[in-house]
Amino acid sequence: MEKQCSKFIVSGHVQGVGFCYHTSHQGLKLGLTGYAKNLNNGDVEVVACGTPERLEELYLWLQEGPKTASVRQVRRLSSELEHDYQGFEIL
């Protein structure tokens, strides 16, 4: 199956609670590549690449996040990103 990339913007109480770390771990567990990073406005940006099914699994996970977080909203942006990420980084 063809690899796709998606960008997600996660809002809520998602910084300072290990959200990027847990997202990286979940991404690797799902066989995805990409990154998670904190944004200046308090949101977290996640870019992930993999099969559509695995991206959907990550999207569903992001809506809950780790127990330490309180996710208010996850926006999924269509992405034409074509980057060959190695692993799942925290930026």
UniProtKB/Swiss-Prot annotation:
It catalyses: an acyl phosphate + H2O = a carboxylate + phosphate + H(+). Keywords: Hydrolase. Its EC number is 3.6.1.7. Residues 5-91 form the Acylphosphatase-like domain. One of its GO terms (molecular function) is acylphosphatase activity. InterPro entries: Acylphosphatase (IPR020456), Acylphosphatase-like_dom (IPR001792), Acylphosphatase-like_dom_sf (IPR036046), Acylphosphatase_CS (IPR017968). It is an enzyme of class 3 (hydrolase). The active site is at N38. The keyword Hydrolase applies. Belongs to the acylphosphatase family. This is Acylphosphatase. It comes from Vibrio cholerae serotype O1 (strain ATCC 39541 / Classical Ogawa 395 / O395).
